[in-house]
Amino acid sequence: MTPEFDEEVVFENSPLYQYLQDLGHTDFEICSSLSPKTEKCTTEGQQKPPTRVLPKQGILLKVAETIKSWIFFSQCNKKDDLLHKLDIGFRLDSLHTILQQEVLLQEDVELIELLDPSILSAGQSQQQENGHLPTLCSLATPNIWDLSMLFAFISLLVMLPTWWIVSSWLVWGVILFVYLVIRALRLWRTAKLQVTLKKYSVHLEDMATNSRAFTNLVRKALRLIQETEVISRGFTLVSAACPFNKAGQHPSQHLIGLRKAVYRTLRANFQAARLATLYMLKNYPLNSESDNVTNYICVVPFKELGLGLSEEQISEEEAHNFTDGFSLPALKVLFQLWVAQSSEFFRRLALLLSTANSPPGPLLTPALLPHRILSDVTQGLPHAHSACLEELKRSYEFYRYFETQHQSVPQCLSKTQQKSRELNNVHTAVRSLQLHLKALLNEVIILEDELEKLVCTKETQELVSEAYPILEQKLKLIQPHVQASNNCWEEAISQVDKLLRRNTDKKGKPEIACENPHCTVVPLKQPTLHIADKDPIPEEQELEAYVDDIDIDSDFRKDDFYYLSQEDKERQKREHEESKRVLQELKSVLGFKASEAERQKWKQLLFSDHAVLKSLSPVDPVEPISNSEPSMNSDMGKVSKNDTEEESNKSATTDNEISRTEYLCENSLEGKNKDNSSNEVFPQGAEERMCYQCESEDEPQADGSGLTTAPPTPRDSLQPSIKQRLARLQLSPDFTFTAGLAAEVAARSLSFTTMQEQTFGGEEEEQIIEENKNEIEEK
């Protein structure tokens, strides 16, 4: 283009011309694209007349210039060829690095493809192999001129024997030495230039790598900030994952140190990349299409961008005000600006280092090699990238591993590491148990509210029946939390048991040790169970009195221990049916149906004092289920029989009684009624306990045939004694919530079977019960 280029003139077949044609604009002046060529031809025509003066010069001068050009032709060509190889190799390596590091946005890649398609071809493998910087071996390889000079020198020595005189060797040796020195200096200079280009190529690769690593690290930091905000805002009250002192904080106050580090590093890197791009546009201009201002963000004034970018030095207060307290949206906007500015810088650098912008061979000098351009453009940009990357990495690692309690344990003695690891395992199990129980409690509260609405509703039976599948589905959703809580509780108990066993081994083994590895030593002192003055955890509220349905008639047929009349059997059968009906109602509200193995396991863990003293060794659930597991019907319908058997068989306790389910509470007034199995486990100085024992009907047969039997006592006579025992249990200060709740359920089920006004029965059953009572009074 000419210096008098008019902005209103549009060249024909140019991209701008085609763009205006597509938009329908035709009101502009069209200039032929051949005008630069014609201008060039005219200038060449003006320069041709001086060449016609050449024949007027002397013939000797012309011959001298020809010889001079012939002598130095090879050396100049060799030098130009080496510089050209170094220039092209460095440019191709730089373009390959920029494309391979993926520091360009897709929009910039498309713009490069439009402006200079040859840049994208530099990333191909074949072009990249051919465009490598020449190695030192290739630079030291002699060319044809060196070989021809050596061959001419040898031929002269052979053709002229007089040159073999000793006096002439010194002259030829000096000439050969000077030639070798000159050749070595040129080779050393070229090798030094090649090493310099290689070093700058590595610097460019490091800068691109740091830029990409910084972008990825900022993305991770923003994700961590966003996750922390979501957790603290949405799940604090449900899962208690955030400490209470942070629950009331503003979302932007979480990870405030990381937010400040992200802002500082993004701001510094953005300003450095912006200045480098502006410097390229000013000092290394390209054509008008490549340097169009609409393609660059760096030309947008700082005041329009905001976020405190226009200030050279900004205080923390001002940054807080500009970014609305380092809010997440402001940081995301600044991150998008950095990504666009970084991609813009590498796009302009790729256009500048394109092979199309390489100077021609005669004009190429070491001062015009592209590594000097790269050094001048980048200046302090690599240092800014590395410093910001280190600062942000340090802050991110601190908040990622220390604030979220994922820091590594400090190096210390091996024993301390093992102890800390075991305590961490216990803490992890307890923490998991807490979260599962809280989630379970929330689900149960929601389910309870829905059940209350269904109970109090006045809707038709059809609408109520439609809600039953929903209730069943919600109960199934609760089951995983119950199982997970049980597993976490077992894990915590096993970890604590390991710590206790190790502590016992350190202090000294007891004199009498059991050979069975699964058997643990019972401590001499019974541990005291302290109940905190707060709401009990849902695990203590589980009622384990519910069992699977068992055929009661078959139990009566097998029972040879009691001799009852036909009327008594019918009366007890009706009472069992009534208790079974009551249990079905209780099951739908208070609990869920458990298997035999799970119920036995939960009883041993939750309601037996023996489980506190013994380790969680693998328990075979077959024997306790088959021999000592009571049915719910027998638990609720045979209270009088169990109490009578407990009073008459105090001295006949066997090993099968240890596996019974006991509901215990401390009571010093009932020390005389304590059985022999409790005396074997605990010392005489321990507090006496009151036991409500649930036995199966198969236990008397396992105990032996020598046991004395007593006829069953009527329930009306046993009810006052049970109420007195319950009153004593309620007065006990150390009475646990679980034992009291289980005893209360048993008492209520007993009262349901003997109450005069039946809730679930009919009028015919009431008459039968009154007749039975009259018969008992007559007897």
UniProtKB/Swiss-Prot annotation:
One of its GO terms (cellular component) is stereocilium membrane. Residues 625-634, 706-719 have a biased composition (Polar residues). It is a multi-pass membrane protein. It is found in: Cell membrane; Cell projection, Stereocilium membrane; Cell junction, Adherens junction; Nucleus. Residues 638-649, 770-779 have a biased composition (Basic and acidic residues). Residues 618-719, 757-779 are annotated as: Disordered. This is Vezatin. The keyword Transferase does not apply.
